[in-house]
Amino acid sequence: MDTADIVWVEESVSAITLYAVWLPPRAREYFHALVYFVCRNAAGEGRARFAEVSVTATELRDFYGSADVSVQAVVAAARAATTPAASPLEPLENPTLWRALYACVLAALERQTGPVALFAPLRIGSDPRTGLVVKVERASWGPPAAPRAALLVAEANIDIDPMALAARVAEHPDARLAWARLAAIRDTPQCASAASLTVNITTGTALFAREYQTLAFPPIKKEGAFGDLVEVCEVGLRPRGHPQRVTARVLLPRDYDYFVSAGEKFSAPALVALFRQWHTTVHAAPGALAPVFAFLGPEFEVRGGPVPYFAVLGFPGWPTFTVPATAESARDLVRGAAAAYAALLGAWPAVGARVVLPPRAWPGVASAAAGCLLPAVREAVARWHPATKIIQLLDPPAAVGPVWTARFCFPGLRAQLLAALADLGGSGLADPHGRTGLARLDALVVAAPSEPWAGAVLERLVPDTCNACPALRQLLGGVMAAVCLQIEETASSVKFAVCGGDGGAFWGVFNVDPQDADAASGVIEDARRAIETAVGAVLRANAVRLRHPLCLALEGVYTHAVAWSQAGVWFWNSRDNTDHLGGFPLRGPAYTTAAGVVRDTLRRVLGLTTACVPEEDALTARGLMEDACDRLILDAFNKRLDAEYWSVRVSPFEASDPLPPTAFRGGALLDAEHYWRRVVRVCPGGGESVGVPVDLYPRPLVLPPVDCAHHLREILREIELVFTGVLAGVWGEGGKFVYPFDDKMSFLFA
């Protein structure tokens, strides 16, 4: 339209969500979507604005990652999600479809209206004939708006048949119960209507509280008015493809921009029940287009996910952040979540790597980037394999010392390389959104050294992106391999031998007098600078331009190192007694105690190596190792009744016992099982021990006796592996260290 006809306002946008999706008449290969903006002006007054975007089937498939999706399927799913009374959890059916839908709609929005920035001053232009936003521009009418929080606590008692949960888990044995609960609610939505609910919301200006014995009836207790919390706003619109104007009815938050919910008390079913109640209330009257009611989070995946989040894709229209209630840095975590939300247009972590580029765009970017590299690096890329040992001078078991040893790392190197390679291969992207997405990746890399939230996003974004594109994983792995080769070449010229690592982090020993600390300090610094310079030169020669100057960090200096496996290594500085243990599993409190025993024992054992009779040293070392195991077991005996101490974390990808039927009766406790499951073995009597998920039962725990012997045998196997490696590495012994637990100590736990 003619820009002279646009009506401009100066506002900021605090949230963008999906309102409606439809097929225009006779359309088969594209759909339209209505997007809701929560805006506010310089005075803080809220405004509801809308934009209409068009998305083609090709764009949808690019973001979906395959051709197995159609615009008709997307529209059908979105239409079903507008009736939460019948379909309150539509994204459970296909979370990937909803990720693709949300990502491609946001991409279309920026392509068709201009890049949108959250909480930043903007000029927003609307077409007065349609009431729709058609243009967005950055402005400088004021400082960025500070996001405002409201504290939300919601608890619901949703009566779900334990047999329904058991049926879901029987279909998916690796399922997490947070997903199973939502799946059961999806299958029987009437149980959400009968739920009891308690909610408390505190904003900067209001307190809102409700208590429902059942959501089918009015609350039995109430404090504060709904109007103090939100404003119900109706806006007349004339979207394309509609014969007449439609009315959008939305909520505008008053004096806040997002909800914060304590992680330990957060319950996705409770929040869905609350928002469902609001949706039903607000849209009870006819005359308005019903909005999409859809969410994403680890609970919406069968196997869950390790990081909790709750993404609001549609109604009510603004985000909810979950943070651990006991975290000392809870305030910083909330600020970080809000910053990540603003930086990534509200799409992270809901859409994953799609926040940068659609999955189908990455192979072309990776191929173009690889074509820009020098032949030697291209060869390293072609040879790279995930199982390849990149740096492994010492084959475990091995021990070195006394000799000056150092650990180094390139902080954030993989993320920097990803951004640089994406920029190298993305210059030919036809889609402007591609360049916008790459610019967001750049901004994250630039912010990461000073902003912990950006580093946390990159820690997940890099592997997510590589998982979405094997060619990109190959490229990044090959470039890291080339970095490793340069590290090894440079090390040989600076009295340094690299013993292990992967390029991003590595360690090695120095050819310096073990007694001369000053000389060692100088040589280590010379090596650090030389490697840093050489790796930087290799990357620049391949046109890989990092966003930050390459920095090789010294993580520790030691005098001894013991390696017992590819990942297992212990470093010790006998001068100041500092150490570092890597590769020992810390699956629970008992494992953490065992790690402390291992570290203390290794210090004592390596202190023997100055003696003159190696054979006697080895015998003495075995005695010290057995004594250490004795002490560990005697200490464990004092904790034999402590189920928390013996619990171990199990991921969905690890084999575990079937859940006992009583585990399905935990109610809202099950909502917290997003990914990790803490299991303790117990002896119910009359048979073998079984694994019990301790977090699925109320406190205080009432359980059969803990099978401490089972847990100790698993822990002792890890300790035996370490001690065997020490004996072989230091004294060249070929025999294993085996602690005689069954003969010596098992009677304590009989």
Curated annotation (Swiss-Prot):
Q: Which GO terms describe its biological process?
A: bidirectional double-stranded viral DNA replication; DNA replication
Highest taxon of the source?
Answer: Viruses
Record has Transferase as a keyword: no
Q: Name a single GO cellular component.
A: host cell nucleus
Kindly report the protein's main subcellular placement as a broad class: host cell
Q: Which residues form a coiled coil?
A: none
Record has Transferase as a keyword: no
Q: Which InterPro entries match?
A: HSV_HEPA
Where would you find this protein in the cell?
Host nucleus
Kindly state which keywords UniProt assigns to this record, in alphabetical order: DNA replication, Host nucleus
Q: What does this protein do?
A: Component of the helicase/primase complex. Unwinds the DNA at the replication forks and generates single-stranded DNA for both leading and lagging strand synthesis. The primase synthesizes short RNA primers on the lagging strand that the polymerase presumably elongates using dNTPs. The primase-associated factor has no known catalytic activity in the complex and may serve to facilitate the formation of the replisome by directly interacting with the origin-binding protein and the polymerase.
Record family assignment: Belongs to the herpesviridae HEPA family.
Instruction: State the oligomer form and interacting partners.
Output: Associates with the primase and the helicase to form the helicase-primase complex. Interacts with the origin-binding protein. Interacts with the polymerase catalytic subunit.
Q: Which HAMAP family match?
A: HSV_HEPA
- This chain's protein is named DNA helicase/primase complex-associated protein
**UniProt source species:** Human herpesvirus 1 (strain 17)
